[in-house]
């Protein structure tokens, strides 16, 4: 997934979930943050950030903040929209299934809507995609805040399995160099427990890291998934 018109800046502060103040070429700019999550471990004052300049002159903000250079970690893409786009490209390119497949984004099934629907002569599968930006001690974790929506998605994937479909949770880790993925038990234990239930029900739990550069992000290598809970 490629970006265009990339600019470097320095993060100053974040008044709310949607905007941040960034110094660009000596000027303080109000920019759009493409992630409404907390991202406190990423958006530290003085951190080098990368932004995409909008081609829409009517926008209130001229830039989107998409990537940060985290100390001792390197580049992390924090754009919450890019995991789905990268996953669509990746699946279409044949990286997940050996046969040729047809991929449909945003597919509705019953009362649910899944990020990707994949079909071929061999399979019918739903894929839910989650972007992961939280990392500590070389462990990627999700979620960074309680997510009832995430729990709902997992239960819907279990239901799809019961109806005869294949079901996948694809965790797109928006960085390189992590050792493994774990649920963020301390932040939302119910999500971790539901993830364990989904695994037992046959849902495929996959995690992949990404090649991240200021102007692109591509899904790359598999990452071990650890669902055991040592947190009480």
Regions found by a protein language model. Give the residues of each.
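Conserved catalytic cores of phosphodiester-cleaving nucleases, focusing on short active-site segments
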Residues: 9, 114-144, 157
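Short aromatic-glycine-enriched beta-strand elements
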Residues: 16-21
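Domain-level recognition of nuclease-like catalytic cores that cleave nucleotide substrates
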Residues: 174-232
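Flexible glycine-rich surface loops and low-complexity tracts that mediate binding to linear polymers
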Residues: 45-56, 209
């Amino acid at each position: 997934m490629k970006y265009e018109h990339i600019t470097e800046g320095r993060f100053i502060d974040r008044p709310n979930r949607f905007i941040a103040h960034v110094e660009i070429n000596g000027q303080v700019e109000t920019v759009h943050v493409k992630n409404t999550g907390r991202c406190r471990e990423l958006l530290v004052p003085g951190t080098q950030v990368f932004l995409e300049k909008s081609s829409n002159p009517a926008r209130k903000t001229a830039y989107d903040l998409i990537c940060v250079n985290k100390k001792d970690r390197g580049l992390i893409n924090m754009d919450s929209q890019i995991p789905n786009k990268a996953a669509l490209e990746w699946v279409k390119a044949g990286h997940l299934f050996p046969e040729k497949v047809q991929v449909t984004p945003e597919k509705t099934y019953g009362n649910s809507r899944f990020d990707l629907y994949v079909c071929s002569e061999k399979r019918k599968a739903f894929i839910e995609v989650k972007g992961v930006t939280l990392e500590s001690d070389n462990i990627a974790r999700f979620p960074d805040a309680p997510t009832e929506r995430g729990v709902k998605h997992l239960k819907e994937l279990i239901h799809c399995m019961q109806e005869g479909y294949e079901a996948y949770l694809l965790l797109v880790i928006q960085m390189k160099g992590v050792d493994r993925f774990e649920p963020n038990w301390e932040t939302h234990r119910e999500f971790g427990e539901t993830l364990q239930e989904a695994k037992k029900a046959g849902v495929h739990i996959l995690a992949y890291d990404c090649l991240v550069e200021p102007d692109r992000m591509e899904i790359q290598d598999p990452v071990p998934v650890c669902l055991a809970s040592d947190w009480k």
